[in-house]
Amino acid sequence: MRWTPPPASTAIRRASSDGQSPAVWYIAGVSDENRFEEPLERLRVRIAELGQNPESPARDKAIRKLSARLEKISAEIYSNLTPWQKTLVARHPARPFTLDYVRVLLRDFVELHGDRTYADDPAIVAGFGVLGERTVAVVGHQKGRDTKEKIRRNFGMPRPEGYRKALRVMKLAEKFRRPVLTFIDTPGAYPGIESEERGVSEAIAVNLLEMSRLGVPIVATVTGEGGSGGALGIGVTDVILMLEHSVYSVISPEGCAAILWKDQARAREAAEAMRMTAADCKALGVADEVIPEPPGGAHSNPLATIDAVGRALVRHLDRLSSLPTETLLEARYAKFRRLGAWEGTAASR
C-alpha cells in the first residue's frame, strides 16, 4: 500500500527562557484545546528519535517499551474522549483525506474535473478507479495539508460547482452501472457571496433529489467532519459508514454556541447536546456502521484506518450489488424516511 505522510503537524522542540532554567519540552502545533494529545505526541517523537540511532539491543528494547506505553496511554485517552475532543480529533490535519483513500485503495484512478456549467472545484475530488475487481466512482471532499493547498481546496468547503461536478460523475456512474463511493469530510459548504450567487442551496438540493433515485449502489464514509448541508450534498446513500472519531451534525459546535448563547466559548457544551459523535449517530439510526480507529485515532496509523475502511466498503458493495435496482431504491427511501421519526408518527410505522 502507498501512503504519503503529511508534513509534520507537530514537533517537539527544546526551549529555554532564561538560559539557566532546565530546557522545557513543548509541542509546536498542538493548541491548548488539543492538550489531551500532548503525552502521545511526546512519546511518538521520542520513538522517532530513537529510531534514528544506530541499531542496538538497548535501542530496540527502549523502542518496544515506549511503543507499549504509547499504545496503553492511547487506548486510555481515546476510550474516554468527550464529544468536543472527538470533534477536535475529527479535524486533525493528519487524518487521511479522500485522495489518501484513493491512492491506497484504488488502482487506475482517473480524476474528472469541472461541472460543465461554470468551473472546477478542487474542494471536491471525483473520478473513477478500481476497488478490488470492481470499477467504482469516487466523490469526496478534499481538505489541504499545507497553507497553499488549503487555500486551493478552500479548506474542504465546496462551492456549487463542486456539487454539480459530483452529480455529473454520479450520473456517469449510473449510466455505466458502476457503484458510487463518497467520502465526507467538510466543515460545510462555502457560504460566501459568490457561492450564493451561483446557487449553492439549489445545487445541494438537486443532489439530494438525484442521489435519492440514483439507480446504482451508493456508500458514504464520514472520515472526519460531516458538516451540515455540505456533507448531505454527497451523503444521500444506501449505507452511511462513520469512522469512530468522526462527527456528523447540522452545524459546528462553535456555530451552535454562537447562535444559542452568543458565545463560541460554549462549544464544548454544544457538542455534548448535539449528539454528533459516531456512536450517537449509530444510536439515532443516522449511521449504519461505526468503523473502529486504531488507538490514538486515524492520524496515528493512517494505513490501518484506510485498510479498515476498504474492507467495510467491499463488504457493503458485495451485498448492495446483489440487490435489484427497485429493491435498492425502496430501501434507500425507507432509510431516510425513518430519520427523525418518533414513535407514533406515520414515518415510524
Set out the residue ranges of the language-model regions:
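Short amphipathic, helix-prone segments within low-complexity/disordered or flexible regions
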Residues: 5-24
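Intrinsically disordered, low-complexity segments enriched in small/flexible residues
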Residues: 22-135, 303-349
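Terminal peptide-recognition signature
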Residues: 43, 82, 138, 185, ...
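Short hinge/gating elements
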Residues: 87-90, 151-155, 296-299
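Glycine-rich beta-alpha loop segments
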Residues: 108, 120, 126, 131-183, ...
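A generic local secondary-structure boundary/capping motif
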Residues: 115-116, 126-128, 168-172, 207-211, ...
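Conserved catalytic cores of soluble enzyme domains
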Residues: 184-314, 318, 322
